[in-house]
Amino acid sequence: MKYFYAFLVLFLVFSCSPEKKGDPLRFKFGTFEIPASDNYGKTVIIRKDSLQIEQYTKKVSISTDSLVTEKETTKIDTLYIKWKNNFAYSLRMKNPKTDLDKDPIFVQITKVTDTSYSFTARIGYSNFKQKGTVYKVK
């Protein structure tokens, strides 16, 4: 009977361990995707060490006197990524082209699933916030 209680206690202890389903560490390295939005095409993100490389297409309107056309251009940005903790990181452009590019981007992870995370991002110290979802590809 003594062994039965010991087994029961051990079983309860190990069966109540927290589930690692929402572990955010898997989002620190790898290839990710942000789906297309109104002005941007799909963004592909590659994270290695302290670098994040983003490739995306941007829609640009070109207007002449009588005609307005849209053109998609492919852009690649390289950013430094610094993790504050498992749910917050900041991004800084490696080669900023404008004053706005010099401001850091603060990202807060708000929800984690098996294959994605939702985030809220803020550029610099402004009140403007952008929300989105990042999907892990590999």
Predicted features, each with a name:
Residues 24-42:
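Tryptophan-anchored aromatic micro-motifs
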Residues 1-4:
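Positively charged n-region of N-terminal signal peptides that target proteins for export
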Residues 42-84, 125:
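N-terminal glycine/threonine-rich, aromatic-flanked beta-hairpin/loop signature
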Residues 17-19:
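Bacterial signal peptide processing site
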Residues 118-131:
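Short, exposed beta-strand-loop hairpins at the edges of beta-sheets
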